[in-house]
Design a protein with these regions (language model features):
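N-terminal active-site wall of soluble small-molecule enzyme domains
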Residues: 1-44
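Short loop-to-alpha-helix "cap/lid" segments that border enzyme active sites
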Residues: 33-134, 138-160
Length: 160
């Protein structure tokens, strides 16, 4: 079976623990300003998000070193993730703290992924995984099954 991932952003630890016990999560994915101590306190593998915008990118090296994976996502002003907008992927190889993460191969990419750009991302940057949502919708909140199938086909073609 595929791993079950719970996605959280600055939630109280009690809330995360309750969701974990109900759903028996395999991974926790943190999108906020969660500390290393907080993330490790659940004794569950975790994915930590680094939000990439126009400002300097801050990377908590201890937190990222201990994460099972790092997720790179777009930040627009104060909105972290869920923007449907792609960040400048060249930062993955031009920004020093991100280069180190890329070298490990333990990273996922989110933010503005769609049928028009996914092949370029996969060929150029080779992420371990993808987090896609609005790029596969025909209207807000409604997934387009044809787009989803085509997207998966592109990913599988690049994975072989």
């Amino acid at each position: 079976t595929k791993p079950l991932v719970g996605v959280f952003m600055n939630q109280p630890a009690q809330h995360v623990s309750e969701i974990m016990s109900i759903l028996r999560l395999d991974y926790l994915q943190f999108h906020g300003s969660e500390s290393y101590e907080y993330c490790k306190s659940f004794n569950t593998p975790f994915i930590k998000t680094i939000h990439i915008g126009s400002d300097k990118i801050f990377v908590d090296k201890i937190l990222i070193k201990n994460a099972s994976m790092t997720l790179f996502d777009t930040q627009l002003c104060d909105q972290k993730g869920g923007t449907g907008t792609r960040f400048d992927w060249s930062k993955l190889i031009s920004e020093q703290p991100l280069q180190e993460i890329i070298k490990t191969g333990k990273y996922l990419v989110a933010g503005g992924l769609n049928l028009d750009n996914i092949n370029d991302l996969l060929v150029t940057y080779k992420p371990k995984g993808l987090d896609v949502s609005s790029g596969l919708e025909h209207e807000t909140g409604k997934k387009d099954h044809e787009k989803m199938e085509r997207f998966v086909d592109i990913v599988r073609t690049n994975d072989s």
